[in-house]
Amino acid sequence: MGATPDDAAALAGVDPARIVHDLVAPQNIDNGALAAFDESGVFDAGLDPFPTSRPALTDQAKEKGEALGVKIKPSGNRRLQPVVDRFFYWLRASKLETQRLGYWWANRMLNTKRPLEEKMALFWHGHFVSSEEKVRDYRKMLKQLQLFQAKGLGDFRELLIGVAQDPAMLAYLDAAANLKGAPNENFAREIMELFTMGVGNYTEPDIREGARAFTGWNFAGTKFVVNDERHDGGDKNFLGEHGPFDGVQVIDIILKQPVTADYLAGKLYRFFVRDEVPAKLRTELGDVLRANKYQIAPLLETIFRSRDFYSNASCGTHIKSPVELVVSTYKKLGLGVVPGVPDFHETISALGQTLFWPPTVAGWAQGRSWITPGLLIERGNFARDVVFPDIGFIAPDRHPGGDFQILQVGEKLARGLDISSATMPDNKDQMATANMMADRDEDFNTRYGSYRGWQMALEKVKPLPRHTAPLNLTQMVLASKTPVKTPADVVDYFVGRMFLVPPSPAERARLAAFLEKELGTKDIAHAQTYMEESLRMVLHLILSLPEYQLG
């Protein structure tokens, strides 16, 4: 995730082999200064198990007289309203808590002494995809992240079994629907297609037989459970082998396939080096993974010590993902905490990568997909928001944002309207039929439940810190070990600090001319009492260059 000049200087005299070894095998490096995730305390036992939908919730409440730990009213209007309020509370609270989780993770990336652990956790997060959109439980997303952090550099077999038994993955790929006699193929398909082998290396019968092996695997809260009555213990024919396989045995058969190591090695190479993986190199790297019994660290050590890694074809060809861009920018600027302004979650979302909300089961496309004309502009906007914070900033974790219906309900209630009037849409012709039916149901009001859910969540979820980046570019430039005397020196200083692939001499000259014009002089010593704003302007331009997107 980048380094400061001091970080680079500290490693200048160290044997490169030792640097790589400590990077891939950091177990003896003390990382105890990193704080654990500070949970808000939004969960209680009554919320588990959480219903699949609001209609499922209200049906359960009507049938049993309670749901989500809340009893329905014996009589009166909107008897189910407290239950519906609680449903929306958890949706909002888990979403906000997951955003807090992303901010916490970004700070770990920024401050860890074991950077490859977090970089690998980011890789696995895009490889073994789960999404809060469907999981709807920050606790499960946290537990999955901790699995990636703990095992991401170790034994791939252990990691793969851990993922197959992970509550977030089980929820995301519908484990509850995978039953003896009626197997659900989602996980069996994805474990081969996306997680281990790649398209074309298995058959549809392999998927069906593999799904049978995983029947009965489920979760209770945040724990993995096996329901023996729902597990199909019969014989299966899977990838050319025959037997009464369970999920772990199916995983072992997958790992025996030669293509599995090649597929995984190729994907890791693309993540760390470049998009094009020569077939011969992919096979050679697969051989390394097989020879080391699927230990990830030796493979990465081989990649990082190879001539290919430092070749012209590889160096400076990696397009930074949004998370890499944002965290490395803060790292190179010497920040110790991720700023709360701009908002981390909104920033990476605008750039195309929302942690814990991947777009599909295939994760993010990586590479050139990160750069479109619109996204390149957004990257420049991010740089500007760091050096010139938005004075109109509204904390998104304290505000429902684009959900205008919730805002309108709150405004109408504040004016003294009753619940029915406050929740009635302004344009009845545009109201969906389903919502019309919900409004006529005297047992509950869906719009009011959504409004109350936000209120209740805001009361419980801890707010994110909202400080801006404590930048002093004047001090930074003047403290340079190489004297900075002219605008051209300033540009060279920022390029040396922030870039792997420097801009052209002509581009540097244009930036220096811009800075000279803003300062009204070529003499940095003369301008040092008033140059902070001009330095921020030129840094914004520098960080918006195409070359800065490369790592």
Describe each model-derived feature in a short phrase.
Residues 1, 78, 93-95, 119, ...:
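Short, compositionally biased low-complexity segments
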Residues 5-149:
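N-terminal accessory alpha/beta regions
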Residues 72-89, 98-105, 129, 137-350, ...:
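Active-site substrate-binding loop specific to GH73 endo-beta-N-acetylglucosaminidase modules
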Residues 96, 111-116, 182, 202, ...:
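Structural motif
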Residues 115-119, 132-137, 172, 312, ...:
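Short, solvent-exposed secondary-structure capping/transition elements
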Residues 124, 159, 538:
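Hydrophobic/aromatic pocket-lining and membrane-interface residues
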